[in-house]
Amino acid sequence: MKYHSETQTWEYLHGDKRVTWNSSFPKNDFYLSDYGLAFFYSPYYTAEDDNLEVCVNGEHSIGWLVTLSYLQEKDEELISQHPEWLNKFASIGTPLLVSHIVQNEPEFLIFQGNECCLSDVDLPSCHVLVYRLSKAKKDDIVSFLPQLYDKGFYYINKLSDVVNESLFYKSSYADNLIKEEKKRRINLKKNVYSEELVKLIKNLYEKWLPYSYINAFSRYIYLYQVVEYFMEIAFEESLFANIKKYNNKNISKNDLRKHIQDDSEEKAKIEMVFNGVSSNDSVVIDFKQNVKRFLGIIGSDFNGTTIGEHVYKIRNILVHNMRLAIDYETELNDIVECLEKLIVLKLKNSISENFNKHIVICDISEKYRTNRKRMRKTYVQFKYDNG
């Protein structure tokens, strides 16, 4: 393998063929020979950002489960927003993956004379485990399989196995291995905080909620971004809860699939964000009434009943049909103020005894209690504290 820094391209000479793959991950000083690859699929983790650090016994990290989608990411700005160590392992995983495909799965190559490149490998449920050989050998990976199996990751010998539906929910190893006593506990850690998320929460504290100096159209979109951040937290919590139920045999595979499919809908995610807010709350009632009045004025049909449907409908109008709303900023402002109040209600609920720490982090360099006090001071008391 040879790396061309000027074009950010990996080159692999295979006989008289030259295989290239452009990579946007910054090259590091790691040696390829110090790392190994193993392939897994998971029908539960299919988003590009479902990258998980693999730790043994809660201590040392052996590597990362990196989605195949993320390994093919070309947006350097997006990559820079992810954890440094994830990107280092992805940088190593890219040339190792190229070598594997050239040697073992050439059907993923596109040939043009003596040149060939990798095709876009569209396997969203596939993960590549990039691991340190100093921390785990190939035989060790076999001993980790039962724990990874329990967490919803199924070992496969090659990428193309993912498209074989008959392999789903089966292990490549005998069932008795899966049922053996587990000697090593595997922990999967998802790095929650990227620079972009920290920036988002900082803006949430310092600009979007406390001030209303921007126009209603932009303000609604800003606030919707806040809701989107909460949506990912809510979906992740729901996903882990359902996987736990499945692993404990409390629900069937079909039920699990249905839960994941239903919860992944954007309107359903919004509903999960606000499920702690009573539908009889005056803020909810005002929000729904203002939305319906606004949609009636601009002539847009709507028969939704849930908070999620109302929030999502206005978002779609502003993103896809702004021309319908452009003359009605005053009416939209009533909706924006209600959405602010809904977010504050969400935040109030989140610092109860059943708080979610993800929501109240403003500065990850400070202690959680410091952040919590700052949140209380910043906007739980700033203008909607008394109704």
Identify the residue ranges that each predicted region occupies.
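Flexible secondary-structure boundary motifs
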Residues: 246-305
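Residue-level signal for secondary-structure boundary elements
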Residues: 235-238, 251, 282, 347, ...
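Charged, non-catalytic interaction/linker regions at domain boundaries
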Residues: 2-214, 229, 333-386
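Short, surface-exposed, charge-dense and proline/glycine-enriched linear segments
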Residues: 246-254, 265-277, 354-366, 378-387
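The feature marks a conserved, polyanion-engaging helical scaffold used by nucleic-acid processing enzymes
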Residues: 197-204, 208-272
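Charged, low-complexity surface segments at secondary-structure and domain boundaries
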Residues: 130-135, 186-191, 242, 254-259, ...
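Alpha-helix capping/termination and helix-coil
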Residues: 230, 234, 264, 278-281, ...
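Charge-enriched, short contiguous segments at helix-coil
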Residues: 1, 8, 288-360
